[in-house]
Amino acid sequence: MVVNNPNNWHWVDKNCIGWAKEYFKQKLVGVEAGSVKDKKYAKIKSVSSIEGDCEVNQRKGKVISLFDLKITVLIEGHVDSKDGSALPFEGSINVPEVAFDSEASSYQFDISIFKETSELSEAKPLIRSELLPKLRQIFQQFGKDLLATHGNDIQVPESQVKSNYTRGNQKSSFTEIKDSASKPKKNALPSSTSTSAPVSSTNKVPQNGSGNSTSIYLEPTFNVPSSELYETFLDKQRILAWTRSAQFFNSGPKLETKEKFELFGGNVISELVSCEKDKKLVFHWKLKDWSAPFNSTIEMTFHESQEFHETKLQVKWTGIPVGEEDRVRANFEEYYVRSIKLTFGFGAVL
């Protein structure tokens, strides 16, 4: 990144969200609670979603970081059953805010066990006592490593700075950064000056398919068997009931793979890509005002807990134009989740 900022006087910023995603994939995946040979064991399987903003900034020689992220990781593990056999489980941990000013004690964690039973619930105390403290440490270190990696990219070198004031700020900033950053590791992320571009804030939907897309993760719960919820997204009469307005182009009673349809007066254009009965649905989905190249993908996985009489709907949503995440999330929660619960009585509405 080329910097044209005499004496480092003016505000300069750098978008580091791509680097942040790679950082957390490298740091979080594989973090464990207990040992695989223990009666209870859990580990982070993958990073499902990272949403938000991440930048490094400087003005008058002072380097700071600004980030506010929502992180969801997928977990797996096992607990011993009453007969001594291992019961495997999968789930998720949602962290609604990892911010530049967060304290180690302020992080909130929402732990979810898919297809939960009273026996599988015994994994939660282990996750809280052994896994979450490790996550707190990683989140606290992130801001320091972010500055150590990218702080130099947004400043003119100290040797070219004539102002004693900004040079003093610059020197003190990097003394603090060096003292707080983690020691370099063999597989540490590279410090690239070309892959992160300066921030350009806009509320407009990107007008090209250049890859300016992001993802979100949702996990609503419905008080209904997975088979009923699954049919609610496929049966055309049910779709008409919870959307109040839908247009189908095939005459069959249910959606079929590769079938396109429109919802909410044509404001949503969708297509059923694939289905696995009572387990998974995949849709292409776009808003009418998105430009042609954009077509997001919704992957819905149904996790039924017969003991707790509920189904968790795991929603992985990719290919959303940058800047549209909040709009898409709000629309799904209001016009899908809330509407389905109210129409069919599939759960409480807050």
Curated annotation (Swiss-Prot):
Residues 190-202 have a biased composition (Low complexity). One of its GO terms (cellular component) is cytoplasm. Changing residue 60 to A: Decreased activation of Hsp90 ATPase activity with a small reduction in Hsp90 binding affinity. One of its GO terms (molecular function) is protein-folding chaperone binding. It is found in: Cytoplasm. Residues 158-175, 203-212 have a biased composition (Polar residues). Induction: By heat shock. The keyword Cytoplasm applies. Keywords: Chaperone, Cytoplasm, Stress response. Transmembrane segments: none annotated. The keyword Electron transport does not apply. It comes from the Eukaryota. Pfam families: Aha1_N, AHSA1. Residues 158-212 are annotated as: Disordered. Its main location: cytoplasm. Changing residue 59 to A: Decreases activation of Hsp90 ATPase activity with a small reduction in Hsp90 binding affinity. One of its GO terms (biological process) is protein folding. Co-chaperone that binds to the molecular chaperone HSP82 and stimulates its ATPase activity. Binding to HSP82 promotes a conformational switch in the catalytic loop of HSP82, facilitating the interaction of the catalytic 'Arg-380' with ATP in the N-terminal nucleotide-binding domain. Although not essential, it confers thermotolerance when intracellular levels of HSP82 are limiting. PANTHER family: HEAT SHOCK PROTEIN 90 HSP90 CO-CHAPERONE AHA-1, LD43819P. Belongs to the AHA1 family. Present with 13939 molecules/cell in log phase SD medium. Monomer. Interacts with HSP82. This is Hsp90 co-chaperone AHA1. The gene is AHA1.
